[in-house]
């Protein structure tokens, strides 16, 4: 199945150490599911421009690009046996940001909330693309928190 590429982003508010999570109806699994901000790229659109556009449309969050850190996790096929959809996955570490009006597609309704890391790590998320970003951040946190400690812990 032919499919446009997409962007998936784990969004981290550095000032509060909270993460942005979404809940929306997913037709493919016929259920409401938790996940991360994501969306299809427009033809010819730059990856970062697409990520920031989707983030603003779904959540109203508009980061300051000059103070935002980006960890590009990688490019992964969503299901290479079924589709050519390539997911560009990243973690955005936000400094200051502003809020704008959200703009949903006609068939889209997304709820979003900022939650602490422990809550995110405990949330049942079934999207593999979202889990790739979350696992990447878990490793980053593990390395950062335990660089001078004897015992690693993902929950500190």
Task: Give residue spans per PLM region.
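Glycine/small-residue-rich phosphate/adenosyl-binding loop
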Residues: 19-22
């Amino acid at each position: 199945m032919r499919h446009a590429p997409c962007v998936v982003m784990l969004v981290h508010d550095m000032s509060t150490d909270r993460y942005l999570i979404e809940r929306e109806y997913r037709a493919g699994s016929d259920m409401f599911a938790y996940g991360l901000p994501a969306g299809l790229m427009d033809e010819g659109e730059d990856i970062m421009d697409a990520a920031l556009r989707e983030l603003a449309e779904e959540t109203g969050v508009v980061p300051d690009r000059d103070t935002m850190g980006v960890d590009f996790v990688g490019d992964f096929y969503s299901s290479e046996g079924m589709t050519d959809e390539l997911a560009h996955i990243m973690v955005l570490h936000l400094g200051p940001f502003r809020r704008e009006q959200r703009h949903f597609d006609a068939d889209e309704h997304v709820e979003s909330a900022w939650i602490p890391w422990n809550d995110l790590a405990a949330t049942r998320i079934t999207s593999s693309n979202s889990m790739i970003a979350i696992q990447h951040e878990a490793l980053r946190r593990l390395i950062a928190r335990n660089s001078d400690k004897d015992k690693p812990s993902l929950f500190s």
